[in-house]
């Protein structure tokens, strides 16, 4: 990688609903060190991030450009192509030089980032591209419009779908071919949604039910996780996990046909607390 900072997402599966086996595997088997220290690699430091609060979204005001300038100054020049560096330089951001726009330029940039943020949100929440939906008549969406992790249209003949890329990275972070390639028994498949069966936005003050079929095609597990449309991070509620997961939540009530009814709303239906995920009145939500 040409970057000084690398971020790798690894997934360890639960065993008997617990993470102990995966934790042990990573702590004993994961070794990251400079090649210059291969003969005597330093000990790994593992930090438990559970229960901690992190701000993982970029600013949507003038501070966005200050964040961008920090990256340009910190990273090696080859991280960005000459074309991208030219765009940065056109607004006063260049490696080795101070970023100090005058009041006129600050005003222009502040307006620009507000419009850009609104455009990205509209692309995500009010799309007009039918390729984003799983099938005709469905309000469930796929992570990659056209199901291409490189956002290429018609296998590249139509170039790169820039709106699709903007949409994806506005609400997601990691990208891998295995989230798009359909291999039986391998990889992972994702669907997400923010509309109910009538096409209305999901409302945290209302109640909803989703049925997971007993023969859902999931070899390891299925999961339904609730997110906040403002932060695009997990919805903050009184529950430690705003989600239901078939490996972890073994106490869920299962129907006679093997299916599972999941409930969403501000309060749990009586007797179905194990199948309920809390939402926040006055706030929207979406599910992956």
Q: What is each of the regions a protein language model found here?
A:
Residues 1-288:
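A compositional/structural signature for long, glycine/proline-rich flexible linkers
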């Amino acid at each position: 990688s040409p970057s000084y900072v690398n971020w790798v997402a690894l997934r360890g599966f639960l065993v008997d609903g617990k993470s102990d086996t995966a934790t042990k595997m990573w702590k004993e088997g994961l070794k990251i060190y400079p090649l210059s220290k291969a003969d005597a690699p330093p000990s790994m430091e593992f930090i438990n991030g559970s229960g901690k609060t992190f701000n993982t979204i970029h600013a949507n005001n003038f501070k966005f450009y200050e964040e961008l300038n920090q990256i340009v100054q910190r990273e090696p020049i080859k991280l960005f192509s000459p074309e991208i560096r030219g765009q940065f330089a056109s607004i006063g951001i260049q490696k080795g030089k101070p970023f100090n726009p005058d009041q006129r330029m600050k005003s222009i940039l502040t307006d620009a980032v507000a419009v850009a943020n609104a455009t990205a949100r509209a692309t995500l929440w009010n799309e007009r591209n039918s390729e984003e939906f799983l099938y005709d008549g469905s309000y469930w969406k796929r992570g990659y419009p056209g199901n291409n992790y490189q956002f290429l249209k018609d296998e590249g003949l139509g170039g790169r779908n820039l709106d699709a890329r903007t949409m994806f990275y506005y609400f997601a972070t990691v990208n891998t071919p295995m989230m798009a390639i359909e291999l039986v028994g391998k990889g992972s498949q994702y669907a997400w949604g923010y509309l109910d069966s009538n096409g209305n936005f999901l409302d945290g003050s209302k109640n909803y039910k989703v049925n997971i079929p007993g023969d859902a095609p999931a070899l390891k597990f299925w999961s339904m996780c609730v997110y906040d449309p403002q932060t695009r991070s997990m919805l903050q509620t009184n529950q430690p996990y705003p989600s239901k997961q078939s490996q972890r939540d073994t106490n869920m009530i299962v129907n006679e046909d093997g299916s599972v009814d999941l409930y969403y709303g501000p309060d749990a239906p009586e007797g179905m607390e194990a199948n309920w995920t809390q939402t926040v009145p006055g706030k929207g939500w979406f599910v992956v």
